[in-house]
UniProtKB/Swiss-Prot annotation:
This is Uracil phosphoribosyltransferase. GO terms for molecular function: GTP binding; guanosine tetraphosphate binding; identical protein binding; magnesium ion binding; uracil phosphoribosyltransferase activity. One of its GO terms (cellular component) is cytosol. Gene3D superfamilies: 3.40.50.2020. 5-phospho-alpha-D-ribose 1-diphosphate binds at residues 78, 103, 130-138, 199. Keywords: Allosteric enzyme, Glycosyltransferase, GTP-binding, Magnesium, Nucleotide-binding, Transferase. Allosterically activated by GTP.
């Protein structure tokens, strides 16, 4: 499995600010979107382009345009919505596929409760967005849904990832690609990432 920990100074700086305990909802939300945008920049670096001739201000001009598979952004509800706008800044024409998952706090297993995928997802590259890759359960279950629907080109974008989640994802779906702003220390006894970001969903939506 391709694993990319983005080490760009802007990514590290912005993620560091997100770890502050008393960060405001507004600031956390802004930074989640900004880091999501930067991760998208990295995740789409291998997109193919083709030459196209357009009419410029002084006559015909040859330009590069992206070709190949179109993109669907797949936020995992609810926290994934916090990264979606940042992703769309780079790929504004992408279609949105939504998957709802929550984690059973006793078993730590993902529980699906909603899905609405674009009709031609088998023709698109999927960018799954979720702030945290902890145990990996929610992301793995989402990939299961996408593959069942015919999607074969999948990349996962997360703000922070635990080694345990990475290992589980690689075992279940070695053909996907993972892009993260940080590979953190690991999980505590409750399945939360250390040092992590706390509850990203609560911080994005201002709930507790």
């Amino acid at each position: 499995m391709k694993i990319v920990e983005v080490k760009h100074p802007l990514v590290k700086h912005k993620l560091g600010l997100m770890r502050e305990q008393d960060i405001s909802t507004k600031r956390f939300r802004e930074l989640a979107s900004e880091v999501g945008s930067l991760l998208t920049y990295e995740a789409t670096a291998d997109l193919e382009t083709e030459k196209v001739t357009i009419e410029g201000w002084n006559g015909p001009v040859e330009i590069d345009q992206i070709k190949g598979k179109k993109i669907t952004v797949v936020p995992i509800l609810r926290a994934g919505l916090g990264m979606m706008d940042g992703v769309l800044e780079n790929v504004p024409s992408a279609r949105i596929s939504v998957v709802g998952m929550y984690r059973n706090e006793e078993t730590l297993e993902p529980v699906p409760y909603f899905q609405k995928l674009v009709s031609n997802i088998d023709e698109r590259m999927a960018l799954i967005v979720d702030p945290m890759l902890a145990t990996g359960g929610s992301v793995i279950a989402t990939i299961d849904l996408l593959k069942k629907a015919g999607c074969s080109s999948i990349k996962v974008l997360v703000l922070v990832a635990a080694p345990e989640g990475i290992a589980a994802l690689e075992k279940a779906h070695p053909d996907v690609e993972l892009y993260t702003a940080s590979i953190d220390q690991g999980l505590n006894e409750h399945g939360y990432i250390i040092p992590g970001l706390g509850d990203a969903g609560d911080k994005i939506f201002g709930t507790k």
